[in-house]
């Protein structure tokens, strides 16, 4: 019996061995068939977009996964641009190497969305990680928390590595959330700027006047005054501004280096500040005091000085000012002072600039011979007779020879010494002749005065001086016409240029008269609009009295000449700062005593004027539940202010006076001093509602440090007041006024929160649906309805398309895209890329499909879980003999009518998936590369890439928690193939065929042996 058994085994050995060997060949060749292609030709794809790197998230429960072993043999010029799932580790190297995946998926619970820009460096490995990887482009990492999958769901993990891209092809396309937040914070921190309200300004009246008469003498300190009466529209806010433009022959600063214009004030409260913009443009900007003011008017007066650079000679000048299209003009003669002269020489001078901050000034002196006469042994000196700084440094003196004609020298005493055609610097030639001293003086000695010279002086004056006077003096001897024993006597010419600084409130006698600069401001308070009722029993009136001291300033002025002859006409240069200090008003509201109010007035006598006060009034309790306190900067009411100022002081906000004298041979002095007066009348109209009440207590006056605070209280019931006359006298009156009035306000029923996204390039989605962004080759198209929540991640570039309706918007980049019909009952996580160069196809109704390639096979079925779609452009492993699978036959390109191919099944027969098993290829229908094969069914299908006979093209669908979508941009495509076209796969198929035949042969032998054995 043992022999029979041994014989039986030996007899069946050939057949069993054949079956075993054939099965091993089939299985082995099937497992290794994917590694055949990569060494001949790779896919050529021109792409402009970035590849997105995704961090896949597996199911929260551990599932058994069937992972095909992938041998990556492609050569990469850059790092792989996809980050695989947690269950797979992909190593890309130059040589082929297998990648083994574990059998269990790891859970993930990441909830944040991270978008990071990574370095453009190439690294040979891409490993599974939750942190950023160094890629050849911008990395986009999406971590979302998935929902728990059903127990019957099997996750198929198939790793795909995108086509490599070089770093130069990478372009940013994702706006990070941090950038959005920073942009929003920047917009929140944006400072609100005002608007130009020039068009809302009405010029009720405008004029340009010459206070000194029908002409202007700039060297005598004369100027013109621009007067405006303006009316503004309601609704002005802080920061709003209006502009007006002056002609170029005037300026607002004279010789002062301070470039500013007076403020518009309401009492001591600044309502608008002025600034010089250049080119004659003046701008006034309103402060926050303008808020809630209506019926705003302003009286503006600005001093205008003749510009010596523009107006260099005597003559008529047209002075203009334009505001809101309305031009105010005046034509007036300009007359300059010729200086002091005799028959031989002329001396003239002018202070060019004056800087109070640095205590410096500049002076220009003309020294020129007259009538062709020359002088010998001439000495010119410059000295500070008043305001000399003995401890100061040496002045800077430059001597220039005038090369032009004498009559062309500017009468305005202006010298553009940088013009070398007219001015030659001869300071170095005066070595030994020019000397300077520490006290600010200089002396220049000339052997002969036969040329015209211009002397430019820069020096200091003593800080704190109330007067500055610079004297230019010339000593000389006329040239003798005939040589004789008679000696001609010498002569002396003296010219003074002085500055007298005094308070704007001063007034003085002089031929120049008054210089007035007023800025009155009127308005009505709008803070209680629509909330108060009643009226005052008597109209409130403001009374302002100005008692100004007319005592002229005491100015020491000296001129001296030689008794031989000639005369001197000297003057003091005047400087005035253009700021106007408005008169502040202290008032007390005096209304009819029959209504129970205070009768009387408050009188304040002061030397300097900022006055504020406090006033407390209670409104009728019938109309208000409570009293609301607020500060009011207006000055309603009546009162009396006596202002006295007779002090000479150096102040930034000050004007200047003039002293002009003429000395004849009899040494008589004419004193023609000029002073300026600031007279600012503020008229306030403040109509407030009726008040009835009774005084509850006395008025308390507290005077400390020259600061007066006046409190008054009015009751809420009718009655008679016990107030009397209140008098307050202080040295430096600074009265704070506080008015407490009630008002009605609204109420917010709840908190309101507003959030705004300022991104302009975001797409607009009006309805939901599935927006699928797919990067790879074989990607199913999903249609149907979603019962779960959709999460969208979008790109905020400007090139995004606009989706008007929902449905399924699918962005597809590659060739073979199957189509899946059914319903999705769970959450789909969709990532979208909307590059500018993608075409858009609309397939009826709500399903917009955006794709770029040829074939779109169609797969029908229904998915009950969350779908994660991954595609591999290489055919999968054929199933084991128990569950044979037949790859789908490629079809010719007919993109107009999509077809519905059968759903492919996963390669593991133990855990079958819902899609139907594809049929194996039919060897009877050969297909040459590049030629389409007739379709297996009558209805046309989406175009697919032609393959060789025996090649398996099977879309692989992995059911996971996330739709994997990386959509690289393709701008231009020429003839390109998706997979390498090599013969490796054909040889693999032949090997599999050989193995199969070997197995069949073995089975046949076994069957034959069995029959023979029975026989």
Curated annotation (Swiss-Prot):
Q: Where is this region: 5 X tandem repeats, Pro-rich (WR)?
A: 876-945
**Which parts of the sequence are annotated with region: Fibronectin-binding?**
513-873
Q: Where is this region: Fibrinogen/elastin/tropoelastin-binding?
A: 194-512
Region (2 X approximate tandem repeats) residue spans: 546-605
What GO biological process terms are annotated to this protein in UniProt?
cell adhesion
The protein's matches in Gene3D superfamilies, at most eight in alphabetical order, are given as:
2.60.40.1280, 2.60.40.1290
Give start-end of the signal peptide: 1-36
Q: Where are the B- repeats?
A: 546-575, 576-605
**Propiece residues:** 983-1015
Q: Which SUPFAM superfamilies match?
A: Bacterial adhesins
Q: Which InterPro entries does this one have?
A: Adhesin_Fg-bd_dom_2, Adhesion_dom_sf, Fibrogen-bd_dom1, Fibron_repeat-bd, LPXTG_anchor, SDR_Ig, YSIRK_signal_dom
Q: Where is this region: Ligand-binding A region?
A: 37-512
Q: What is its main location?
A: secreted
Q: Where do the record's region annotations for 4 X approximate tandem repeats lie? A: 746-875
- Location of the motif LPXTG sorting signal: 979-983
Task: Name the domain of life this protein comes from.
Answer: Bacteria
- UniProt function note: Promotes bacterial attachment to multiple substrates, such as fibronectin (Fn), fibrinogen (Fg), elastin peptides and tropoelastin. This confers to S.aureus the ability to invade endothelial cells. Promotes adherence to and aggregation of activated platelets.
Name of the protein described by the UniProt record: Fibronectin-binding protein A
Source organism (scientific name): Staphylococcus aureus (strain MSSA476)
